[in-house]
């Protein structure tokens, strides 16, 4: 492995910070947990974890080539992503999301419904897209990554949010 324990720890802390910022996944998870308890929320958390396998892999494989060609552009993109994160946070504080209706698609009963909402919530989550495409290259030198490095990064990318989501669902 070319990635150090220190780099992986910093990335895990970044993932924990990303999880702690409310977004579409939180809305879906809270809606399902409040409407059906932990048994309705855990399939969503698994769906999110599966979806969380896609973005880092896409970022690592796709951005390795892009970074080798357009490295300076990605440096600018990191700052743009940071600014967008700040704007999203301010907007969330100023105008919280509207209340969910009782017949919402987010609260449809069934394990498959919860799982599919989880996958869709993370695949379409702009916060996740910006983090993986804008910030992940700042944690690691993508050209140096080996297959075991990629496997550990993907594992961290799925495990940290899943643990947080399951913990939140248990708490609710």
Regions found by a protein language model. Give the residues of each.
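Short, solvent-exposed loop/helix junctions and linker helices
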Residues: 70, 80, 109-113, 145
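Alpha-helical transmembrane segments and their lipid-water interface positions
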Residues: 51-63, 85-89, 128-129, 161-172
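Selective transmembrane alpha-helices of multi-pass membrane proteins
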Residues: 69-100, 157-170
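A general structural signal for well-ordered alpha-helical segments in protein cores
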Residues: 26-27, 83, 116, 129, ...
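Alpha-helical multi-pass membrane helix bundles of inner-membrane/thylakoid proteins
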Residues: 1-4, 74-75, 87-133
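Juxtamembrane transmembrane-helix termini in multi-pass membrane transport proteins
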Residues: 2-75, 134-153, 169
